């Protein structure tokens, strides 16, 4: 990780000094926990500001004004915990629920949320066990968790109620959309990623049901 990567990402995001300090603390926590728990791909850690933080922050622009978020399979808190840290000042009413089934990763999320003051609640549980508990969710997101058809199966109760889905994807975005349309009807667009020209954010809305 270079200082220029950090400075460039923070300048582009136009965050306050306090939010920058909280993101620095997140990065320090990630590096410390990475030595005992493989939270992210080891090769991506030197590029944490561009590969993970900037990649997560761009989701805020994909849902302007949204303050109730749900992040599934949070892992290292990407994107959910990063959004909760950045949203603390940018969107004072921001609340992000993070669902992670792995207890060790859940412990990382809980400790880091506490230290950074992130507007986050951690649920150490399987998605299927808790998805029905969430109401009033404006955006549900998940990164590097599952193919789109499975994501829609998990989040259908929310997406049918007006929640928007934001799912970062790589080159497979279009093929996963095609596969999902074999089962579901929905509206979708792919927002080009600002951090990877071969990737995009699949935005799903108006899910209306499974096809026969």
Curated annotation (Swiss-Prot):
Annotated GO CC locations: cytosol
Binding site for S-adenosyl-L-methionine: 73, 127-128, 143
EC number: 2.1.1.170
Location(s), subcellular: Cytoplasm
Keyword Transferase: yes
Cross-referenced InterPro entries: rRNA_ssu_MeTfrase_G, SAM-dependent_MTases_sf
Reaction it catalyzes: guanosine(527) in 16S rRNA + S-adenosyl-L-methionine = N(7)-methylguanosine(527) in 16S rRNA + S-adenosyl-L-homocysteine
Pfam families linked: GidB
Keyword list, A-Z: Cytoplasm, Methyltransferase, rRNA processing, S-adenosyl-L-methionine, Transferase
GO terms, molecular function: rRNA (guanine-N7-)-methyltransferase activity
Cited Gene3D superfamilies: Vaccinia Virus protein VP39
UniProt record similarity statement: Belongs to the methyltransferase superfamily. RNA methyltransferase RsmG family.
Function: Specifically methylates the N7 position of guanine in position 527 of 16S rRNA.
UniProt protein name: Ribosomal RNA small subunit methyltransferase G
Record organism: Methylobacterium nodulans (strain LMG 21967 / CNCM I-2342 / ORS 2060)
Gene encoding the protein: rsmG
